[in-house]
Amino acid sequence: SHLVVLLKQRTITGADADRLITSTATTRSIEANLLDGYRQMIQVDLIDGPRSQIIGQWAGNQVYIALGNLLTSAALLGVDTCAIEGFSPVDYDRILGLETSDYQSCVVCACGYRSSDDKYASLAKVRYTANDLIEHR
């Protein structure tokens, strides 16, 4: 079994923007200066602008998209997973040495194979019906 800790970035810096521009230019085989407008938009909107205050929240949302892909991919490979949100990010950050970094623990996911001795693994799963959960309007 493995415990995967997914991290979110707390802020976006000019160095992050430069890295994105360089990577984009390289991938697209274009001159980086052709992306100056894009780089300026990132600076004005996401680094210096009011949206800089919500980057951490946005980054957390992006982590959950990655988590969804992790859960789906693992299921396709027959690997059991359990997403864990009820943990102490501060303690995980301390253990992982992230306290002074620009990254923060966001969600944890246990991955592995269930024990054949697990008496709960074969019990019927309790789920609400679609009618209980979905309202059509």
Residues covered by each model-derived region:
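Acidic, surface-exposed loops and disordered segments
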Residues: S1-R137
